[in-house]
Swiss-Prot record:
GO cellular component: extracellular region; membrane; other organism cell membrane
Protein keywords: Ion transport, Membrane, Secreted, Target cell membrane, Target membrane, Toxin, Transmembrane, Transport
Stored InterPro entries: Pardaxin (IPR009990)
UniProt KW Ion transport keyword: yes
Organism this protein belongs to: Pardachirus pavoninus
Entry's family note: Belongs to the pardaxin family.
Domain note: Consists of a C-terminal hydrophilic region and a predominantly hydrophobic remainder.
Subunit structure: In aqueous solution exists as a tetramer.
GO MF terms held by the record: toxin activity
Taxonomic superkingdom: Eukaryota
The name this protein goes by in its record: Pardaxin P-3
Subcellular location: Secreted; Target cell membrane
Amino acid sequence: GFFAFIPKIISSPLFKTLLSAVGSALSSSGEQE
């Protein structure tokens, strides 16, 4: 089913790039407060 694709999505370079971008955005917004 759908859940079989989750490990592939998580291990994909694009997901890691997106995750790091979101993480840096969250940390930067947290510093502003």
